[in-house]
Amino acid sequence: MSKYHGLCAVRYGKHVAHKAPLMVIALAAGLFAGCLSRPALTRQLFTFATPATRSSAGPKNGRVLAIRHISVAAPFAGQSFVYRTGELAYEQDPYAQFLVVPEEDLQEPLRGYLLNSGQFEAVTEAGSALKPTLLVEISVPQLYGDFLNRTEPAAVLEISFTFFGAPNGLPDKMISQKSYHQRIPLKARTAAALMAGWNEALRRIMDQAAHIAAM
């Protein structure tokens, strides 16, 4: 058995399921308690927080930003929370999940933060009837809970932004590209604390990224 006590031990469940289905339930009850504190086998669903829209009207500068697409690195693109348990070892937790896949879950929060930056008259999604003057492609290379050091668990989030001019509503030359990384210590070893850490990481990243929007 892993020293992480099966921290979301998907591998163990798959390994024994065809031999002893009842044993899987018993194993899971103990295994899943090793990383996060929560009732055993209770499925929890979470979402990124969307910031409140600022009451002041956006600048009438004619700048319309369209989020062309959001992509999340394949290891972290599913609904299940992912935990780092070794230098090159990660495990998925089927009992702590995003409500929808992360790339969809991040759409509204990112749009809200970009709109609140005060740099754009509007921030739209791909396919909007509103013609953009700028486009942004957003990628998320890292999105996981780091439990490699069991005494210092943390929420890890990295986001990269690539802005393009769009004089005709289509991508033109690249204007800027920047990546931001945040590591937030967890206040508790719970899925809710991990989600809170990711939300704080997102807030800090968007505060840092606000100056990109001003280019």
List PLM regions with ranges.
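N-terminal secretory signal peptides that target proteins for export/translocation
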Residues: M1-H18
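Sec-dependent signal peptide recognition
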Residues: K19-I25
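C-terminal motif of bacterial Sec signal peptides marking the signal peptidase cleavage site
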Residues: F32-G34
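Surface-exposed short loop/turn segments
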Residues: L36-S56, S117-L170
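N-terminal segment of the mature soluble domain
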Residues: N61-P132
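Short secondary-structure boundary motifs at beta->alpha junctions and helix caps
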Residues: L88-Q97, N168-H211
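Sec-exported extracytoplasmic/periplasmic mature domains
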Residues: R111, L115-Q119, G145, A210-A214
